[in-house]
Amino acid sequence: MSKDLITGAEAMMRSLEHQGVTTIFGYPGGSIMPTFDALYDHQNTLNHILVRHEQGAAHAAQGYARVSGKVGVCLVTSGPGATNTITGIADAMIDSTPIVVIAGQVGTGFLGTDAFQEVDLVGITQPIAKWSYQIRRAEDVAWAIARAFYIASSGRPGPVVLDFAKNAQVEKTKYEPTQQEFIRSYVPVPDTDEESVKAAAELINNAERPLVLVGQGVELGSAQEELRIFIEKADMPAGCTLLGLSALPTDHPLNKGMLGMHGNLGPNINTNKCRLLIAVGMRFDDRVTGNLATYAKQAKVIHFDIDPAEVNKNVKVDIAVLGDCKKTLAAVTGLLKKNRHTEWVDSFKEYEAVEEEKVIRPELHPATDSLSMGEVVRAVSEATRHEAILVTDVGQNQMISARYFKYTRERSIVTSGGLGTMGFGLPAAIGATFGRPDRTVCVFMGDGGLQMNIQELGTIMEQKAPVKIICLNNNYLGNVRQWQAMFFNHRYSFTPMLNPDYMKIASAYDIPSKRVFSREELKVAIDEMLSTDGPFLLEACVVEEGNVLPMTPPGGSVNQMLLEC
């Protein structure tokens, strides 16, 4: 009988394998050592990526999940190891990213005694995770993992935290594979009301000036094709949120660009001119709506979403179509008449012309010798034939990349949208290379964000991860400086940056690099970067006080976008 028993740590490994896990991002330590010992015997099936900081593990798991559609996994120890993942957990929660964080914990006999590296991880993470649970017995491992993966990946995805007591790791138990399929108190996908489907279709069929707002929910629901058919049948222009940018190809004739504070003029201004606003898998966050008191007050609103909590949270809706958007979009489309809104669609051209003249042309073809941020981004996008996965950090690099990178394929943008986490980019890009090893991964970073998790260059070196790092170096914390210039009378309070030599740092990690100042150097360096097997760091020295435009001022309406500073 004893031969049939295995440790809780071994049960953890088998449970992860049963869930189809192949990649784990982690960092060992005292309270999780029995599990890492079990992992030693599973290296042929479970590829463990040793990060250099636990925050890096959480963000790498996010990057992996976002590009692959699978659940990302990270494995860390208790105390500081666990708390170092908190930012990644919060980031995953607000951006609906499915990850499972497994952290060691002191033995149950030591709980509540302030033991070495004891921290109440369940208590800390309950507000920022879909489910937090402490595994106290080895016999609970299999069902806890099954439930964790089910909750993380079903409905609106998100992070799950498992606090794995040390005694549960070493206790013996009988293992039986478990697959969670139902939890009575948890309804991940609400039932779709047929009446709401009919009402939505009727409103769309009779609408003048409809506008579709495309969110990340389209990609989370693998509904890109359903979205395309939906907008084409009714001839409806669309704008995409930051996280929804690759849900619709950039060059689709009905894709009118990005929504939000630094988005395109057309979809932003016409939000306040449309007669019907159709939100699909987006949550009306403040960066998209601007001043809610003036947002789309003239329009009827239809909201497609899988999460009932998002309906009427920020914007009052007339019709809520709840459920999986892949199914709900198809259901509504089946009731739509073929329509034409030629005059309405053409009205976007006026704003496109203004933006081209006032913003895009000066950014992509600057009059000065200095490189602009936008021309670097567009050059990389064109060199990859617009097929690369774009990962960004946070700051000006994020907004400029989102504006000037083009998207032709699904799941092609990975960025920290809701939490805005500087330091996200580098580890997320590592995760993306493991999630989609068949695709080129380019990460754009500022000189500020690059230094926040720069230790992950060690992970890139060890794994030979083919991350193409583009540092837009302007010697400033650029986004904060832009706000200081626009709203704080150019008082640059602690935003100028004295930077290290990034090429020397890259060399220390045995990563090829290039620093460029001119357009001629940029083209040569991009070609070298993309032809290099493995990682590469391209430092583009851009104009120091460049700004990301247009911009909705804080507290302003979406139709009050600024075209100059």
Each language-model region and where it sits:
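Conserved short loop/turn motifs at secondary-structure junctions
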Residues: 215-219, 365, 446
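Thiamine diphosphate
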Residues: 102, 111-117, 268, 312-314, ...
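Generic enzyme active-site microenvironment
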Residues: 161, 303, 391, 444-445
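Active-site diphosphate/adenylate-binding microenvironment
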Residues: 9-22, 30, 35-40, 352-427, ...
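N-terminal alpha/beta PP-like core and its mobile active-site loop of ThDP/TPP-dependent enzymes
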Residues: 2-343, 383-386, 466-469, 506
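Phosphate/pyrophosphate-binding active-site segments
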Residues: 1-3, 139, 175, 198, ...
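Active-site nucleophile and cofactor-binding loops and adjacent substrate-binding regions
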Residues: 27-29, 48-59, 74-81, 136-138, ...
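Short, internal active-site loops enriched in acidic
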Residues: 166-169, 397, 544
